[in-house]
């Protein structure tokens, strides 16, 4: 390839171009690529949203209760904008360096140590997330199934959490994770998206089925009482010590950065502007679903909202068909997120240990199988999965969402230090360090 006047350096034989236009396709339009077609814009959005939204949606109503409606709205909007901005920095660095992986950005910024650091961070974060999701499946799926089978006697195998975990891992997670391209998961990601939409719709509907003030638990809910006392008045702002514990839930609500570049690579006619539009649409739709479900969940229970939203509905509407089905839908949505997270985790392993070898289906299958076994064993045998990986996740998530994009751009960006881009990257870096330190401190305090 001929070096242009705007090339900035070369590393390991890669030409680094700083003069590309944002609408220029990053990947060459080879005959093989033209025949495969790439992933459509819609499927790319669904995949990104599936990476964004998980079980964390159940904790946002609690976060609103602890920060107030306007406080929550401002914080969630800021987090969404910061997530979009950090994705913008990642895509801009891909344009500058002509590489398409998070690990290689670390390589260009800080050499092999940077590549290993990014790969280890991605692997730890994704293994922790997948194990936590499977732990939720093991803990909650038996109760969800039992709600459809109230007459079950004894302890049948289909109500055993470990058995269900192994079955779902072998029959659902593993086959989907073995797919050669992340774009193929667009179908399951679209299904997961509709599960989340269904969840938000049910939360809105059930606002008018539970009266305020909340009745005694032995009271049959049949009508709406006027919320004319203080406990039924929503708070616009509410910042206290408890508010701080809600911030980590919100800070990581839009974490999808390990999946952004794999989705980018498979996008049909990939360019920075097109992938940025994918990210903007995905984040905007996720914000909308987050906000609607959080708002109506809070307006249903007010200060009595649980840290896991569906617990309140299970108490006051224990036999409601919509609540039973929505719990199952959330579990299925969480389950369908696991294969999507498999892709960047497997890629991190490949980049660390097999980057100099050509692609091999046997290696692809073996690495996927080993990762699947590890996360299943962690979900089965680690008794308090969410607490263990809460500490690790708060650090790795902060790095991937805020610290690395800001730090790498400070190193790789061609602008002056006083430029808006460099200033924004520095701000993102400092903010990420503060959020990570705050989240880690709060989690340790909560465990103590």
From Swiss-Prot:
Keyword Glycoprotein: yes
Transmembrane segments: 40-60, 69-89, 117-137, 164-184, 185-205, 244-264, 281-301, 321-341, 365-385, 388-408, 425-445
Residues carrying a glycan: 218, 228
Residue segments, region Disordered: 1-36
Bilayer disposition of the protein: Multi-pass membrane protein
UniProt subcellular location: Cell membrane
Extent of the signal sequence: none
Entry keyword annotation includes Disulfide bond: yes
Bias-annotated ranges (Polar residues): 1-12, 26-36
Location, primary (coarse class): membrane
Highest taxon listed in the record's lineage: Eukaryota
Keywords, sorted A to Z: Amino-acid transport, Cell membrane, Disulfide bond, Glycoprotein, Ion transport, Membrane, Sodium, Sodium transport, Transmembrane, Transmembrane helix, Transport
GO biological process, one term: sodium ion transport
Intrachain disulfide bonds: 212-232
GO cellular component term of the entry, any: plasma membrane
Pfam assignment, any one: Aa_trans
Role this protein plays: Probable sodium-dependent amino acid/proton antiporter, could be a neuronal transporter for glutamate.
UniProt similarity note: Belongs to the amino acid/polyamine transporter 2 family.
Name of the protein in question: Probable sodium-coupled neutral amino acid transporter 6
Native source species: Xenopus tropicalis (Western clawed frog)
